[in-house]
């Protein structure tokens, strides 16, 4: 989302669409990963202690969920940042400065999707529409409809997913289905992931 990352079709859409919806009188929440190239000091990010502190387990490893927030003053919008030192600290979006894709991009996407959903639960917010943008949010729709389907925050939510280009050049590591497993999902829900 601009101004936190450089301008691209996805970052501009992530900035302008929520503002437009908010200006039409709707309540919005905007989330994005706290990429390593986002300057916390310049953008005035600060941790939200009441939302942070949970651990998410991915592939039998605990990963602390840290929630930060900043405001886009000109739009009167808050942006929530999903953060974790293992997945986002000192790391760019898809690949490092030399163009090498991160081997754990799948786990980063799982962590981000689950982090957003757990934060929405803690906020006790019931969104009518959840608009997922790009590869990082790809797991959110499946989790909402299968693993979080009885959760009051998501029971009546509709999910829209927008894709943007093909950022990946290398296939996802084998075993993605096992890493994405959550209570409420069945193996058949994840079998398609193992062939990616």
Question: For each predicted feature, which ranges?
Answer:
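Catalytic cores of nucleotide-sugar-dependent glycosyltransferases that transfer UDP/GDP/TDP-activated
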Residues: 1-196
């Amino acid at each position: 989302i601009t101004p936190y990352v450089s301008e691209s079709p996805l970052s501009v859409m992530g900035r302008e669409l929520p503002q437009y919806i908010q200006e039409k009188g709707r309540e919005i929440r905007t989330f994005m990963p706290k990429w390593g190239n986002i300057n916390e000091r310049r953008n005035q990010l600060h941790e939200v202690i009441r939302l942070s502190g949970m651990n998410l387990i991915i592939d039998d490893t605990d990963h602390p969920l840290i929630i930060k927030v900043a405001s886009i003053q000109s739009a009167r919008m808050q942006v929530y940042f999903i953060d974790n030192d293992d997945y986002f600290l000192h790391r760019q979006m898809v690949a490092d400065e030399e163009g090498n894709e991160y081997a754990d991009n799948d786990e980063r996407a799982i962590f981000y999707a689950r982090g957003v959903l757990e934060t929405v639960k803690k906020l006790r917010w019931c969104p009518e529409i959840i608009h997922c943008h790009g590869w990082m949010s790809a797991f959110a729709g499946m989790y909402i409809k299968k693993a979080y389907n009885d959760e009051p925050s998501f029971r009546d939510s509709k999910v829209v997913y927008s894709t943007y280009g093909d950022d990946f050049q290398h296939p996802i590591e084998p075993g993605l289905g096992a890493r994405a497993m959550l209570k409420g999902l069945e193996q058949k829900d994840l079998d398609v992931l193992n062939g990616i």
